Design a protein with these regions (language model features):
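Structured-RNA-binding interfaces characteristic of tRNA pseudouridine synthases
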Residues: 1-250
């Protein structure tokens, strides 16, 4: 009897060339599929909630797969964690309806971009946060971040490629910049994201910090629908997929 399983995993993306399998490159999906093969002796078709790029991390990454194997979800979880490397972990495994799809059933995601704001770098955060030397005024950046809220055409905040053809409108439901000690976090949630959208948003907020823009420039950048108007693309190391939303969670 066919079953559909939802697995939630997390990973440190530092050592991987993103989620998706690539020829001659180590990917999270490739390593995960090898662990699945060790456990099930077969290769299920994995449906992922998203595709993270090289060096991007995930605190919650969801995938679904249909199985005819009768292994209980809790046993599959334990067996996968046995075969997976220390920088990937399965958090949960549960049966879901057959029509559930990790990507197409998703109604939103939350990302967090982490910035270590201290003149001295932290060796423990290398590859896990952006190191920014000069003091960040989180209140000014939070003011700028409020302008991302709502439904907008985010053409100015994406890298164009064949993954993003068509509608560039996304609805941002959460956008804030906060500080906890020396760690500054940009948190943003939306019904969907364009390619490099969060990293370009972050780069633009840092450009506000540097005086290239003022918070009130953000609406003009959005309205311009031109990538050249926004700030640079922030490095991948500070980006985390924080949460994936499915009904009725949102």
């Amino acid at each position: 009897m066919e079953r559909n399983l939802l697995l939630k995993i997390q990973y440190d993306g530092s050592a991987y060339h993103g989620w998706q399998v690539q020829e001659n490159a180590r990917s999270v999906q490739g390593v995960f599929q090898e662990a699945l093969k060790q456990v099930l002796h077969t290769q299920p078709d994995i449906k992922a909630c998203s595709r993270t790029d090289t060096g991007v991390h995930a605190r919650e990454f969801c995938l679904s797969m249909k199985l005819s194997h009768n292994i209980p979800p809790e046993r599959l979880l334990g067996a996968l964690n046995h075969f997976l490397p220390p920088d990937i972990a399965v958090l949960s495994c549960e049966e879901v309806p057959l029509d559930f799809h990790a990507r197409y059933s998703c109604c939103g995601k939350r990302y967090v971009y982490e910035i270590w704001n201290n003149p001295i770098r932290s060796p423990f955060l290398h590859g896990r946060a952006l190191h920014y030397y000069h003091h960040i005024d989180e209140n000014k950046l939070n003011e700028a971040a409020q302008h991302f809220l709502g439904a907008h055409d985010f053409t100015s905040f994406c890298t164009l490629d064949n993954r993003d053809m068509g509608d560039f409108t996304r609805t941002v439901t959460e956008s804030s910049v906060t500080r906890e000690g020396d760690m500054v976090r940009f948190t943003v949630a939306a019904d969907g994201f364009l390619y490099n959208m969060v990293r370009i948003m972050t780069g633009t907020l840092l450009a506000v910090q540097q005086g290239r823009f003022v918070p009130e420039d953000i609406p003009k950048i959005i309205e311009g629908k031109n990538r050249k108007l926004a700030g640079p693309t922030a490095p991948a190391c500070g980006l985390y997929l924080e949460k994936v939303f499915y009904e009725p969670q949102v």
